[in-house]
Amino acid sequence: MAEGSASVLALEAVTLTLPSAAGPVNILRGVDLAVGPGERLAVIGPSGSGKSSLIAVGAGLEQPTSGVVRLFGQDLARLDEDGRARLRRGRAALVFQAFHLLPNMTAEENVATPLEIAGGRDALAIARQWLDRVGLPHRLTHYPHQLSGGEQQRVALARALAARPVLLFADEPTGNLDAKTAATVADLMFALVAEVGAALVMVTHDPVLAERADRIVRMADGQIDTGKIDTGKIDA
């Protein structure tokens, strides 16, 4: 993040400890991280290193055990669940490896519904515009089961970005896709994030995808590894 710029997301000495049958498990261990406006950050590291938990805590979906998480300058610990949801609404969006589309809604309804919930006008028209932007003008009335994996992720991208968020969290956004489709979805994601001016926090195992970010951080054993990053060994 550029020095002196305001953070859209800041984590300070954040820990996350979860119970297990074998006893408490330290998922995050003293994480410090700041993401500036419009910055594209890739988070890499082996499975189980805390990458997805970092996104969950940063987005306010999981409460840390200790430390401070500030989203758009707001201390998430001072907000209840409804308050965190209101803070995210229209300003933060999420895309996951699993597409999380509502199966009983068409593509255009999946994109329009969050806009309607947020009180936006012309939600259906905006949804259609965004589905056109992701190359799916011919899939407006198709249900998720009628779409390929790549098409479902494009719908998820359109849904996430239609409200023109300030920050997009993406957890393995191309993880369920073949190489060709993954490249197409990645191109779309980076182009549309730039178009709306959003910051991006992206978890990925893909070194090619990671290298498209402005900055890469590596997670190891619940901490940010400050050593030299070799993107050719992301899964090591």
Question: Which residues are covered by each model-predicted region?
Answer:
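ABC-family P-loop ATPase nucleotide-binding domain
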Residues: 1-17, 226-236
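ABC family nucleotide-binding domain
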Residues: 8-9, 14-212, 216-219
